């Protein structure tokens, strides 16, 4: 079994963590995030170090302690540094444009797609074929990136579509006569 919960979470300067019962709030330069700690997990805050432990020795409690530690660590990283995901558009006429909290996509359909970004996620388009999504919330960022990719996932024959910048698209050979 993994022992993720055994390593404590360090709070960098400028990050404040507050606990109210099972509710934990993390504030930092990039925003504020909140989470509810599972009942089987005990959280201790000592100066700039946060430790997690299972309330009992059950396997599920130890696993949940590791999960909660990872989630709080992602929150601390998010409010201090932030997260970003890069998407690349491949295809003739495929374009993206960020306008405020809306992402305008032209992906070869008969109509353009206007995707409203949720609160806490910002989009930049350094070029017409690149989308840079930024957020303090790692889970929300991944969800938004997945939804944008789902409009036109990369196809295996020509590689056209929306893909993550670090994604490898496995190519297929065209059918021979």
From Swiss-Prot:
Keyword Translocase on entry: no
Domain of life: Bacteria
Alphabetic keyword roster: Ribonucleoprotein, Ribosomal protein, RNA-binding, rRNA-binding
Residue ranges that the Swiss-Prot or TrEMBL entry lists as coiled coil: none
GO cellular component terms, A-Z: cytosolic large ribosomal subunit
PROSITE patterns assigned: RIBOSOMAL_L6_1
Keyword RNA-binding carried by entry: yes
Cross-referenced Pfam families: Ribosomal_L6
InterPro entries: Ribosomal_uL6-like (IPR000702), Ribosomal_uL6-like_a/b-dom_sf (IPR036789), Ribosomal_uL6_a/b-dom (IPR020040), Ribosomal_uL6_bac-type (IPR019906), Ribosomal_uL6_CS (IPR002358)
GO biological process, one term: cytoplasmic translation
GO molecular function: rRNA binding; structural constituent of ribosome
Protein family (similarity comment): Belongs to the universal ribosomal protein uL6 family.
Subunit structure: Part of the 50S ribosomal subunit.
Main function: This protein binds to the 23S rRNA, and is important in its secondary structure. It is located near the subunit interface in the base of the L7/L12 stalk, and near the tRNA binding site of the peptidyltransferase center.
Name of the protein this chain belongs to: Large ribosomal subunit protein uL6
């Amino acid at each position: 079994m993994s022992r993720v919960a055994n390593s404590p979470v360090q709070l960098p300067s400028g990050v404040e963590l507050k606990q109210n019962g099972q509710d934990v709030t993390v504030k930092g330069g990039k925003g504020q995030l909140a989470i509810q700690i599972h009942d089987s997990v005990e959280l201790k805050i000592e100066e700039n170090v946060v430790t997690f432990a299972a309330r009992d020795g059950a396997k599920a409690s130890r696993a949940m302690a590791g999960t909660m530690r990872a989630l709080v660590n992602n929150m601390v990283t998010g409010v201090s540094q932030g997260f970003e995901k890069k998407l690349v558009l491949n295809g003739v006429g495929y374009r993206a444009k960020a306008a405020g909290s809306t992402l305008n996509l032209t992906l070869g359909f008969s109509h353009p797609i206007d995707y409203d970004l949720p609160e806490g996620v910002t989009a930049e388009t350094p070029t017409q074929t690149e989308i840079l999504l930024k957020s303090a919330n790692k889970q929300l960022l991944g969800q938004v990136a997945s939804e944008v990719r789902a409009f036109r996932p990369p196809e295996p024959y020509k590689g056209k579509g929306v893909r993550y910048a670090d994604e490898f698209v496995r190519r297929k050979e065209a059918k021979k006569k």
